Amino acid sequence: MSSPDTKLLLLEELEDLKRMASHLAKSLDRCAGIDVSSGRADLADERVEAFTSRFARTADLLVNKALRTLDLHELESPGSLLDVLQRAEKRGIINSARELRLIKNLRNAIAHDYAGDNIAETFELCRQWTPTLLSATQRLDDYASNLPE
């Protein structure tokens, strides 16, 4: 794939990521009043399901799509998830590869419904890590805007 093609693909994936990040931010705001200590009734709220699903989708788009396409565009050899995250850290897109691995593990728990039994903890972790995802999305957007063809 040529560089202009990979840049176009990256920009398309980045638009999807930014759209999902916007939905995630709105869901975070809508969940602000939910108190997980009050019992499972609040956790059965559709807002919680929408929020955790959007968190998982945003993490997936960032890690599995956009960051991997950025590597492809910059002619990096495909590698493991750790390789992708370490390169993103070196570029200044993420603060820490370790943090993004935790986010990716949380995403996997949500996607494979391992989170059902621990919904309160999952919900709180999603709230905790959402600013990190939103920040990484913005930094990737900034980084991509300075890429050569």
Predicted regions and their residues:
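Solvent-exposed interaction patches of small proteins and small membrane subunits
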Residues: 1-149
